[in-house]
């Protein structure tokens, strides 16, 4: 029996931050890999790097991943883009489209996810949190649309009760702990199994290692965790202050909805500017269309419907079930 090759692209979430296994990070992708096929029939390569943005995935991780010609590739990325002053939804859209298209041309199955708003996870005040939330919603809308466009197996992980279950999250409040990583792996496995793409035993939702003590978590947050947040947010802070001031002005004038409309329009323009996707190697237009029609998200709703539903789908699509 031919082995299944799974390649993971992304940032610290996919690298496994929050799920230590000995002296290294493990994470949801490694946990998922063990359930894709029977023991000894899976090859797993994790190319994710902490701090990566969509540019890094396109320029560095994708070429390395394409050389491996995987059967399955996960592309879970975008939060770090929202934490930079250079955030540009047009650039994010173009990069993700190029990454998805490159693997689709090889006939590789795409695995994607939309992600929580970092401002809400950090518990930032409203005026600071809303600009970040608007950015993350924009990224998620793009991921929804492109996942449908390329027939990806997509997990809606941006909302629901799992976001407020502290047992699932690490001390930094941005990364899942072991339980959270296991929840991601379990839910991704369920989607792949439904599509006939995972035949191994699903990952266990129960942790393998003891939960870090409160003192250990606080020590990590005060040292490595604080540094992690600072490195990713320092260049954003001056701009975030300006965004917050703008947020407060619009709120005082009763025109906050204009900011949301502007963000939605930018997403629509970015998606409209994309060219028609290429077909897989040896594939046909009909085959590509069939993949897009049959791709489903966590709720079993076709990708286009989930994208249209947007935030209203979040409460019923949490990955904690």
Kindly label every feature range from the protein language model:
Residues 23-24, 87-92, 127-135, 172, ...:
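Alpha-helix N-cap and loop-to-helix initiation/capping positions
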Residues 122-156, 178:
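Substrate-gating cap/lid alpha-helix
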Residues 105-109:
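A short helix->loop->beta-strand "cap" motif at the edges of active sites that frequently abuts
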Residues 1-50, 60-69, 270-283, 288-290, ...:
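Serine-esterase "nucleophile elbow" of acetyl-processing enzymes
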Residues 15-19, 54-91, 117-118:
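Oxyanion-hole/transition-state-stabilizing segment in secreted/luminal serine hydrolases
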Residues 8, 75, 111-112:
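Structural beta-sheet core signal
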Residues 46-48, 114, 156-159:
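Residue-level recognition of beta-strand->loop/alpha-helix junctions
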Residues 149, 172, 179-321:
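Conserved catalytic region of serine esterases and O-acyltransferases that act on ester linkages
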């Amino acid at each position: 029996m031919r082995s299944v090759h799974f390649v993971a692209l992304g940032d610290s979430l996919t690298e496994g931050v929050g799920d230590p296994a000995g002296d290294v990070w493990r994470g949801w992708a490694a946990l998922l890999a063990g359930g894709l096929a029977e023991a000894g029939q899976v090859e797993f390569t994790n190319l994710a790097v902490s701090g990566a943005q969509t540019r890094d995935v396109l320029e560095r991780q994708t070429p390395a991943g394409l050389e491996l010609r995987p059967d399955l590739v996960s592309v879970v990325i975008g939060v770090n883009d929202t934490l930079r002053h250079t955030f540009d939804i047009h650039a994010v859209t173009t990069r993700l489209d190029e990454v998805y298209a490159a693997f689709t041309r090889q006939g590789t199955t795409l695995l994607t996810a939309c992600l929580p708003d970092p401002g809400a996870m950090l518990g930032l005040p409203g005026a600071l949190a809303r600009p970040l939330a608007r950015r993350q919603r924009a990224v998620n809308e793009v991921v929804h649309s492109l996942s449908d466009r390329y027939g990806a197996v997509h997990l809606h992980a941006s909302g629901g009760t799992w976001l407020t279950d502290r047992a699932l999250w690490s001390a930094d409040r941005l990364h899942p702990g072991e339980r959270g990583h296991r929840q991601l792996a379990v839910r991704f496995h369920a989607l792949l199994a439904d599509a006939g793409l995972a035949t191994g035993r699903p990952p266990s939702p129960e942790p393998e290692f003891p939960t870090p003590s409160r003192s250990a978590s606080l020590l990590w947050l005060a040292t490595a965790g604080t540094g992690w947040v600072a490195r990713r947010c320092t260049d954003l802070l001056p701009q975030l202050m300006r965004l917050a001031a703008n947020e407060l002005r619009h709120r005082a004038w009763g025109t906050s909805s204009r900011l949301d409309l502007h963000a939605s329009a930018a997403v629509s323009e970015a998606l409209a500017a994309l060219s028609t996707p290429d077909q897989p190697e040896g594939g046909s237009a009909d085959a590509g269309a069939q993949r897009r029609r049959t791709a489903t998200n966590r709720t079993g709703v076709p990708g286009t419907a989930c994208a249209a539903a947007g935030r209203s789908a979040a409460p019923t699509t949490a990955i904690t079930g």
